[in-house]
Amino acid sequence: MYMRTRYFIAGILLLALFAGCSSDSGEGDAPGGGSGDLYGYVRDASGSAIEGVVVSDGYTCTVTGADGRYAMQRHPNAYYVYYSTPADCKVEVDPSTGLPLFYQKIRKSQAQYDFTLTRQAEETKFRMLAIGDPQVTTTAQVYRFETETVADINSYVAAQTDGLPTYAITLGDIVGNKWELYPDMVKAMARSKTSVPVFQTIGNHDHEFPQVTDLSAQRRYEASFGPVNYSFTRGDVHFVSMDDIIHKATGSDAYTSGFLDWQFEWLKQDLSYVPRTCAVVLCVHIPFRGGFNGAGETYFDEVLELLAQFDRAWVF
């Protein structure tokens, strides 16, 4: 989206308090193109199975059984296999990047992908910070992001005396069509810098072009930040981050807003595992109100109907 506000010092758009309900280097076989079974086990650090964890390839969602096993038919375009972090498990952080780690890259030659989660008591209260439109275009702006926005986050977290866990999520446009700055922004948002795990949402300026398809336009982003449609739960709040940019990709930054049919199906499946008494927060880049209102918008009404099934739901 064209910059709603280019904030660095005031980069924290939302401070919300809610009350509670293995890393891959990216080297090797190219993902996609396979249709074989995709399966694995989700266990805790002691090796015990964790039942009821939702696992996805970005197209299909399934859930682990009593033995911790999940299985699904891999979609040909699937790039990652990943889990939705349950409320009673820790947000794992990649030791090399410092960002949340809940996914593994899919390889044609590999069918089994196991995950180890760390159990914890379910949080009854926590804080979530939202960061909007850093949209950096130079290393100097990355430096400002680190010394102003990240510094503000650290100051805010340090000032809290109640000991509540704190998380953060970006709301898109991490860069302004300068995709070579992704590694710098990964470093800037590492937990060692921000003091909190920072989840990501893709924006229109995060799609690389020219590319052949909308999917290929998001691959460079995914290689740095992970899946573009995913979820996690803290307390009784289920967070969903989605790509609501349908990018033309071929030769310009033209796009429309909305969701594709397979994204809507993925969201339906993800939410089918969430109790209706839970709150749902959908994080997207293009606002459902007051944002880009193009003729190409798709599935906005259907998504709102899905969210209306829950006692509490918000779109950020």
Where would I find each of the regions flagged by the language model?
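C-terminal motif of bacterial Sec signal peptides marking the signal peptidase cleavage site
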Residues: 17-20
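N-terminal active-site segment of His-dependent metallophosphoesterases
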Residues: 33-37, 88-182
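Short, acidic Ser/Thr/Gly-rich low-complexity loop/linker segments typical of extracellular
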Residues: 53-74
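A short, solvent-exposed beta-strand micro-motif common in secreted/extracellular proteins
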Residues: 74-95
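Extended active-site neighborhood of metal-dependent phosphoesterases/phosphodiesterases
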Residues: 87-92, 100-105, 180-268, 272-274, ...
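Long, structured stretches of catalytic cores involved in phosphate-ester chemistry, encompassing
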Residues: 277-316
